[in-house]
Amino acid sequence: ININFFKNRRLNLAKDMEDNSVLLLNSSSTILRNNDTTFPFRQDSNFYYLTGFEEPDSIMLLMSSGESILFCREKNPDLEKWDGFMFGLEGAKQEFHFDKTFDIKLADELIPTLIQGLSNLYSLIGKDTLFDNKLISWMSKANSMERHQENINLKDFSNTLGMKRLIKSNEEIELMRKSCEIAANAHINVMKNAKSGMTE
């Protein structure tokens, strides 16, 4: 998929947001398997839908203006030896067409400033309790900065984003057809070569 594809999704979704609003989504987290290993990572589907970014510990902000911001991990050559390639801030900005990128370690410091003075904050409420608590904390800090402004409204965006994902683009439909073709050919090949008494 062309990376512009994800940027266009963000721009298209921003049109469904009220003016002076922001959408915040968080990535999946790594899940510890035992002391020093984790389960294979799978990105949150909604986060991937809008970013194409497949690293953990990330947060996306989409402004109603269409501006998009990504918080992610700094590039770390030592960590890459164990966990694989990392885009880092500049790499993520260039490859995934974000307007700005920041170190995820600065999220608690910068997000209240970024959402300060906005009318609405959208997210997928109830999906991740820990992230919901972060949202409330960031909103509280932002509201305290704007003593003469109305407080930011927290609104669930699940239905709007879900309806967007239901409608497939021509590119998505072509990929789905290709996937079905590969799966069908694999099943046909297995059936042609299956013999009595064979096991998996």
Regions found by a protein language model. Name each.
Residues 189-194:
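Short regulatory/linker helices and ligand/cofactor-binding micro-motifs at input modules
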Residues 1-188:
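A composition/biophysics-driven feature that prefers long, compositionally simple stretches
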Residues 195-200:
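Signal-transducing coiled-coil linker helices
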